[in-house]
Amino acid sequence: MEARPISTDPITYLDKDGNQQVCTAYTVLTSETKESILNYDDKWYDLPAGWYVVEGGVTITPRLDTHGEVNLILTNGSHLTAEWGIDVKVGDTFTVYAQSTDEGTMGRLTACLPADFNLDRMVHYSVWPDSGMAGIGSSARWRAGNDGIRESEGTIVINGGNIRAKGQDNASAIGGTRAEDIEFRSTDRGEVYNRRQGGSITINGGVVRTEAFAMSVGNCTTVESVGIGTCQMGYGGSVTINGGTVIAEATCDAITTGYGGTITINGGDVTAIGGVNNFAEDLNRVIPGNGIGPYESGSVTINGGTVKASAKGNGFGIGGARIYNTGAMTVTINGGTIEAAANRNNAAIGDKGKGESGVTINDGVIHAVGKGSAAGIGSKGDIRITGGELTVSAEGSGAAIGGFADSYSERVNCKSITINGDVIQSISSKDGACIGGAAGGSVGSITISDAELPLLSAKKILIGWDADSPGGKLTIRNCRVASTDTLSVLTDGIRVGSNSELVIEESEIRLPHLRGIRVGGNGSIAVRDSDLHTYGIFMDETVHTITDAKTLKKLEITDSTVLTGDIIGARGEYSSVEEVVIRGSSIRLNEEYTYNYCTIGGGTKGSFGSIDIQNSQIHIPSPGLNTAIGNGHQAYFNRESRIRIANSQVFVGGAKFGPAIGAAYGSSRGQINILIENSTVTAKGGNLRSDTDYIPGIGKNSSGRASEIGKIQILNSTVESFRLEEKDGTNYVYDDLHTKELPGIPAE
């Protein structure tokens, strides 16, 4: 190509900081057009290193090919149309400047490749490709002597101008071609791969738009086209947005990077929509694509700006590893105003990476919505939230914060969730937890501390998970947790699955009617220095054989106040609680609940190992079919159990057909020993099955099936034990405990 004339008339432009600068040596671009790119022998328009200026309307049909550092100034009112785009390959830097920050005044650059080229596939790719070319960026280059080259990417800097770009299939609008290798060849030493490297894209100002690839015919789900960043399968690369207005729409990922690449947003007004279906043949097809985030591994960091990101199809609003999870993927938010949505699966903000992956939120005003099986904020790794103002919801089976289902409808469990401080302004979910697992999922650990959570709302679990999890732990410390949900069936409020630990410390928990605090089999519960209003605190597991029996290892309540409507312990066929420890606490039955049942120990079909109550106040006037303190109705166990009440005040009513303290009616086998010392105890036996029945306040039913009472010891205590005189009566009289003549119980 002949040398172009150089102009020396001073021309101004705005630099990356918006300051006016002057250029005094540049080339003014002029139009070069033909009806078709195929009419050119040389289909490339070389731009050697230097400065170029666009004045008025300029159209160039061949693909512009940068060499070295190429700077382009768009004067006010100008418009450069690069019909076949601008090639920026490795080693090249392409920088765009404008003269104004006003969108209506600043110069324009359009690099939208034709969508209707070679639809009949009559042009061989070696003549001119119909895929693999970016609007601005690297290409699949099929030139003589360079056949098979898929270029690594160069450096693109946009400081101003009104930029509009669209690439081909298998390419970016702004970025590069889609390929893992630049080239592949076989030699006598084996196969040789040359990995394709991503480039650097920086947007400091201007208005930048990318259009989603579209076809009038064909299967849209086979299209691999992205907006801004390294196209799929490249390595590394970066996108940095410091200012300006960015509107990125793409068939797949709207703003993206290669394996292990980075996306950083420090400012500007950014809108990113991935998974856009602009295909006339089938507008209902679901396309995979993230709003902001890579195909696989990498990082997204948002430090400021206004960001709106969504995945219309399968993908993350902000995040990545939507298909494979071959490496680490992280999302970090340190500031900004952010709206994110995932419309089908994955998460509005999240990841599915391997290794040191996760989501960290330190600040920012964030609205995140997960629809379908998506989470609001989700991760396969660690979620850590220590600052900001969050409004989060999940409208399907995903958790508001936690687990989700991926693009293949496979459940993704979160490794850990940490929330510190009053960061959540509003949170709700449908079938997943507000904080925890997706429906049927689990979490490795959850820690919520120093937080006054907003009113929680969900159809199922509020906090936690319901699936088995080896060694899972949920800790709530120095928090206030409340919900005003109106429920018609028993629903877990705070829940962990089997083999897990639940710890509540220095907290206030207010759960509505029918919401309880529950752990799965072989787990444990500890409540310390807390105030709880709950349906119950318990394990509820039913199995069909004793060999599969589930156990609550330990239930500890220390220095706490508990208002409950049901069990504190374990229930379910063949279930048991090994140890109940109550220290310095007040436990009362919530008499507002219609069922008014409460048991400390074994609930229905549940047994216990030991119950140790010290320095506490217990008020349970109506335990239903179970004892207030002891085992449950129809409990089966074959061991010796122990009840100890020391330095406490206890008022308990009797179970139906059973005592208040001891063995419930219908229980079988085993033996219970009872020790009361330094305490004041009032116990009333339950209703009689017949007028000949004898049901004491402490002990067992004299007729019918019940576990044995081994020994009752009363030391330095005031104990009043009553029984009803007749069936359905109201007149209580002292039973024979004080004479040591209770039926079926040996004297000391």
Predicted feature residues:
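Catalytic-site microenvironment of enzymes
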Residues: 78
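Substrate-binding N-lobe of the ribokinase-like
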Residues: 399, 433
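Accessible peptide chain termini
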Residues: 1-2, 748
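Surface-exposed loop/turn motifs in large extracellular/passenger domains
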Residues: 46-49, 63-72, 87-170, 174-312, ...
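N-terminal domain-start segments of secreted/luminal proteins
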Residues: 3-71, 474, 478-479, 488-489, ...
